[in-house]
């Protein structure tokens, strides 16, 4: 359940956020960029508006990445050089964690000792770095997994690659070491307990948010005109990374059974989908529906609004989804959602009220559910969709994040009453080294 605001201990003044494998500045829908990127950036921006300074550490991926990007007052992104810019994918990054950690520690050394109040790591790779930073800086570590290897491997799409064993080992270490664990839903909390023996008292449920100022209902005809779509067509959209996990092929196969439906796909290949980036286009040809499928590249937030508004339905057929930010964004635009009944999607979508949930990935079931929603008239769900999405504001998310941070700081001080003394000794050593004398 959500944290009450009266559970908030001393709020942090400065937060170090770790996002090793993907930059919050990357375009969602490309490479490894997705909902996590949105979460990291938007939570930082909204915390900064409350006077909390946030520094986000991520791995530089091109030589053109500046060392520091000031995104907004109170929000910095530090691009840490760790390994070659080209030729590394997410599964190679464990070999670069030492280099990344060194870059983080060097950046921290430019500040006065005790600069950060807390470390928040996102994804298990960042958790490995956060574990060391926590011990070096004598501050608590809060960790958000976003996805778990065991959960993904239990629901693999056909032809998808399983997560390697080393990831499960790394995740277990971070779960054991983190001072608090933040999850998107109650189900994810249960999975941490059952799969990783996490202490339930250290877990906080914090739902991701949606930008309710950007994602709003609007004129469908205007949105379709901007995208070159026929205003008379029935449109079902898919938004996200093109990879087996996200299952866009399920939507195409279902659409092949629905001759009056146009499919709109917005996103780029990612993960194992990079091995055959044109597979989805080839599938549309094979199914004989290529004339009814429109492919768009990954969209900016402003352009994404048009996609949601243009659609009669948005489909989220993922095999695994810790929350499903696309589903909430679509509903905020007044568009009902048909989604797989997996992970956090039953929280993001109210079955029968703001859309529909489908058990499993049988193409016939998906076609039937889409047809039923379209026959019922998606417009009847629009108001409920907007009202439901309004409960997922970033303001609510940051309320709960800061409450979790406050509790982490309070608990850490209780468990480590001499943390300030430890920090003072390290401070003395640091200044002594700078002066060239022994402490």
Curated annotation (Swiss-Prot):
EC annotation from Swiss-Prot or TrEMBL: 2.4.1.250
Name of the molecule in the record: D-inositol 3-phosphate glycosyltransferase
Top-rank taxon: Bacteria
Record-stated family: Belongs to the glycosyltransferase group 1 family. MshA subfamily.
Assembly mode: Homodimer.
A single GO molecular function term of this UniProt record: magnesium ion binding
Pfam family membership, one: Glyco_trans_4_4
Residue positions binding Mg(2+): 308-309, 311, 335
Lineage: Bacteria, Bacillati, Actinomycetota, Actinomycetes, Mycobacteriales
Gene giving rise to this polypeptide: mshA
Binding sites annotated in the UniProt record for 1D-myo-inositol 3-phosphate: 21, 32-37, 90, 123, 147, 167
Catalysed reaction, written as an equation: 1D-myo-inositol 3-phosphate + UDP-N-acetyl-alpha-D-glucosamine = 1D-myo-inositol 2-acetamido-2-deoxy-alpha-D-glucopyranoside 3-phosphate + UDP + H(+)
């Amino acid at each position: 359940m959500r944290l009450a605001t009266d559970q908030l201990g001393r709020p942090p003044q400065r937060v170090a956020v770790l996002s090793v494998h993907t930059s919050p500045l990357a375009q969602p829908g490309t490479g490894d960029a997705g909902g996590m990127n949105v979460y990291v950036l938007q939570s930082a921006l909204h915390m900064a508006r409350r006077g909390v300074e946030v520094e986000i550490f991520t791995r530089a991926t091109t030589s053109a990445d500046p060392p520091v990007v000031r995104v907004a007052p109170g929000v910095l992104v530090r691009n840490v050089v760790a390994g070659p810019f080209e030729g590394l994918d997410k599964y190679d990054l464990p070999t670069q964690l030492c280099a990344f950690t060194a870059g983080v520690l060097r950046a921290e050394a430019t500040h006065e000792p005790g600069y950060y109040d807390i470390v928040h790591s996102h994804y298990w790779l960042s958790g490995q770095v956060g574990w060391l930073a926590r011990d070096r800086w004598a501050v608590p570590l809060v960790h958000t997994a976003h996805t778990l290897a065991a959960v993904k491997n239990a629901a693999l799409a056909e032809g998808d690659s399983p997560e390697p064993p080393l990831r499960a080992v790394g995740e277990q270490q971070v779960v054991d070491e983190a001072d608090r664990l933040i999850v998107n839903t109650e189900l994810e909390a249960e999975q941490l307990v059952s799969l990783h023996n996490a202490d339930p008292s250290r877990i906080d449920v914090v739902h991701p948010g949606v930008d309710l100022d950007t994602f709003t209902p609007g004129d469908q005809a205007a949105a379709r005109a901007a995208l070159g779509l026929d205003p008379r067509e029935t449109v079902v959209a898919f938004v996200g990374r093109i990879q087996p996990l996200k299952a866009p092929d399920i939507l195409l196969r279902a659409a092949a059974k629905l001759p009056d439906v146009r499919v709109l796909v917005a996103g780029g290949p990612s993960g194992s989908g990079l091995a055959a980036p044109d597979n989805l286009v080839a599938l549309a040809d094979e199914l004989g529906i290529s004339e009814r499928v429109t492919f768009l590249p990954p969209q900016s937030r402003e352009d994404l609004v048009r996609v949601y508004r243009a659609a009669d339905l948005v489909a989220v057929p993922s095999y695994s989804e810790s929350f499903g930010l696309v589903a909430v964004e679509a509903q905020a635009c007044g568009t009902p959602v048909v989604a797989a009944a997996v992970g956090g999607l039953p929280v993001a979508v109210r079955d029968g009220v703001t859309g529909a949930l489908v058990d499993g990935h049988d193409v016939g079931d998906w076609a039937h559910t889409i047809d039923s929603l379209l026959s019922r008239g998606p417009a009847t769900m629009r108001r409920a969709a907007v009202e439901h999405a309004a409960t997922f504001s970033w303001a609510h998310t940051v309320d709960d994040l800061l409450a979790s941070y406050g509790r982490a700081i309070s608990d850490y001080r209780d468990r480590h009453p001499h943390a300030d003394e430890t920090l003072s000794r390290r401070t003395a050593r640091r200044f002594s080294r700078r002066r060239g004398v022994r402490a």
